[in-house]
């Protein structure tokens, strides 16, 4: 009987510990440590709020698919994804309205009026290059350069049918080559040509593969390239292609019927706080609130003249045509 009592007590203590741990947890889909320096942000969230957020390496599309699959019994509390996926999540009714502190300082076009999604930062798409892995080849300066045979097997872009940055790549290339959101023929033609150059097409962030030299050239955002160059001290260059590119926001949402809603709200409050926005700025992301980027960080960006080649698009329209583009890409390219 005494042994049984000790065993029961141990089980109860373990259960209480698990409950306590759960009480201090918020599950975030798509918070990978090697992307946008989420690793530092999550440590700051834990230190400031006491809420632990486990790392998660899904991409935007995988996160939305998981939310839809779990709609009847949600697992996640918050989700981070590209703006078009935020719009789709709202349409699928898998996210709830929440307006964090600092909400009023988010520009009107970068948040849902009811709080179902809101931007937290933005970045500009371009070409991230591990110069040492090029074997003496010049750093490509244009989308056209990536089609050259000398770069065969060296170029990577994330899957446009799943990852937001992949879809952004398609939209940017399409726009740069004369297409628009009603006509993706230029992008499809480009990816068909690039396919002959043996590209690498991962679904998740390939940051570490660029740093190792396994993937010398990656279509990616400025913030990842600057982090590689100035924080990880890699010989990495970032190029905004001569034909042009686009800048896009990333957004977050509170999951509908989140199991740890209060903790999820704390996470969302923090990423929009002065401290959270300052961390994004230090990670080379452009904060969505008017938080000053450190002078030394701003000085490491490409000149404004280069950024003049990056435009913006209608994100609502971009979301509306995303599914059709993905289907066409899978049918005609992949």
PLM features per residue range, with description:
Residues 83-90, 211, 216-235:
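A ligand-binding cleft/hinge motif common to bilobed small-molecule-binding domains
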Residues 105, 123, 188-193, 199-200, ...:
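Periplasmic-binding protein-like
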Residues 31-39, 75-214:
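Extracytoplasmic ligand-binding site segments that recognize negatively charged/polar headgroups
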Residues 255-310:
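Mature extracytoplasmic/periplasmic domains
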Residues 23-88:
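Early extracytoplasmic/lumenal segment of secretory-pathway proteins
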Residues 126-133, 171-175, 248-261, 271, ...:
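A bilobed periplasmic-binding-protein/Venus flytrap-type ligand-binding module shared by bacterial periplasmic
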Residues 297-334:
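Extracellular/periplasmic bilobal clamshell ligand-binding domains
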Residues 95-104, 117-118, 144-147, 217, ...:
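Short beta-strand->loop
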